[in-house]
Amino acid sequence: MARYTGADCKRCRREKTKLFLKGSKCDTPKCPIEIRPYPPGEHGRGRTKDSEYLLQKREKQKCARIYGVLEKQFRGYYDEANRRAGKTGDELLKILESRLDNVVYRGGFAPSRDAARQAVRHGHVQVNGRKVDIPSYRISENDIVEIAPKARELTPFIVARETAGQGRAVPAWLEVIPSQLRILVHSLPARQVIDTQVQEQLIVELYSK
């Protein structure tokens, strides 16, 4: 599957906000967007007034980059959200949050969603006792996500276990048992408990044209 291979920090600067693609570095003064809070390139400091279309497109790109999803798959998620009974923007974020790589990241078992994707692809993650190596696998209510027994002594997971509770907060819809490297999915999140800083209505407006 195709993936973006450019510099992560340039993506954050392009969107003029932190996308939290580099793990703990994003929370330090070394984060490039703290040093250079303007887009990369020769004309990055220039003042331009974005059109309505560009604002909508940038918001879609920002959301897709946060969750590490390329355009074709992102559009598929939007189409699915649009068929659901709830508000399309809310449903889109619920779908993105229910991805396995996101749940591994939210549970604190990886410093970034990219690292979580790698852990899943390498077969280090189980769902309900079975190995799942597809990052886009959709988690359901009452699922149990855990690090596979053979992987629990790998350095990233030792660190995750020993530093549990010291980093970002685990969302209320998940319960983490650090000693077992296990995540209990109590529910799927409502929009009001999703802290992703995106204006999903702009995405809906873009795709509705």
Curated annotation (Swiss-Prot):
GO terms for biological process: ribosomal small subunit biogenesis; translation. It comes from the Bacteria. PROSITE patterns: S4. GO terms for cellular component: small ribosomal subunit. The keyword Cell membrane does not apply. It holds the Pfam family Ribosomal_S4. Keywords: Ribonucleoprotein, Ribosomal protein, RNA-binding, rRNA-binding. Residues 98-164 form the S4 RNA-binding domain. One of its GO terms (molecular function) is rRNA binding. SUPFAM superfamilies: Alpha-L RNA-binding motif. The keyword RNA-binding applies. PANTHER family: 30S 40S RIBOSOMAL PROTEIN, SMALL RIBOSOMAL SUBUNIT PROTEIN US4M. Belongs to the universal ribosomal protein uS4 family. Part of the 30S ribosomal subunit. Contacts protein S5. The interaction surface between S4 and S5 is involved in control of translational fidelity. One of the primary rRNA binding proteins, it binds directly to 16S rRNA where it nucleates assembly of the body of the 30S subunit. This is Small ribosomal subunit protein uS4.
